[in-house]
Amino acid sequence: MSTAYDDIKTRLQGSMVALITPMLRDGTVDYKRLADLIDWQIEQGTHCLVAVGTTGESATLSMQEHSDVIRYFVQHVKGRVPVIAGTGANNTMEAIKLTQDAADAGADCALLVAPYYNKPPQEGLYQHYKAIAEAVNIPQMLYNVPGRTVVDIAQETVERLADLGNIVAIKDATGSVARGEQLIKVVGDRLVVLSGDDGSALELMKVGGKGNISVTANVVPKAMSETFTAALRGDFDAANQVHDVVKHLHRDLFIESSPIPAKYALHKMGMIDKGIRLPLVWLAEQHHATIDTALVRANLL
């Protein structure tokens, strides 16, 4: 593959936020708040932005909205940091269309979640990703999150996919450091291995991971950036010192299905309106105190 593919591999590192998609109370995308969040994340040191991933409510945006939000990200970021576009689907043809739209918009990389609900076998997973890789000329990242998709991309399948030149990375959201470490051993020479689990991401960095695609960074981007910048240079004492102040958020921001708690937190911080799409609903009142206390502990309120 071209040097552009090698270049993006060197830039897929550090603290990478899976940004929420801000919405008005009627559920429409709030582009003004989205611009503000993008600028804030970059100012706070976030290394990469993920548009319309799981945390961005990809499952409930229409295909047109999905592509529109990705295009807006790219246009507003203007090359300041890489934009990773969530373009996965459980319909291969839809995933190809979304990925092509992201490539046309100028996204730096496509994030492709494993097909959910229809539970393909490993050969189906391989053929799904192979079809997208062959159809669209853009760096692509595998996304394994079996807790949501109910399908697990096996290591052997990842090894096969690593031979396809435009698959450049994997986001491993299994939460298993041992598994991530094994991936680094077998495909680390070909793929960038990233954590997709805030709670174990720093531990994965200690064994060769390159960064973290984070929910928590929605709320504390500077702390997460400082943590993973220190980790990248091998200074884990400094990383832990910053991380210890905010690591409770990794638990509390999942007190309900993500991104419900993160959206509540950002609303409480005055950064977004009270908008979310069904079937997700606003944070239950009995959990407000948990998030409020977590924000106070992180010096955010």
Curated annotation (Swiss-Prot):
Residues noted as binding pyruvate in the record, renumbered to the chain: T55, I213
Site (Part of a proton relay during catalysis): T54, Y117
Subcellular location: Cytoplasm
Signal peptide per UniProt: none
EC code(s) of this entry: 4.3.3.7
Alphabetically ordered keywords of this record: Amino-acid biosynthesis, Cytoplasm, Diaminopimelate biosynthesis, Lyase, Lysine biosynthesis, Schiff base
Active-site residues per Swiss-Prot or TrEMBL entry: Y143 (proton donor/acceptor), K171 (schiff-base intermediate with substrate)
CDD domains (alphabetical): DHDPS
Broad class of the protein's primary localization: cytoplasm
Family: Belongs to the DapA family.
Protein's job: Catalyzes the condensation of (S)-aspartate-beta-semialdehyde [(S)-ASA] and pyruvate to 4-hydroxy-tetrahydrodipicolinate (HTPA).
Protein name, per record: 4-hydroxy-tetrahydrodipicolinate synthase
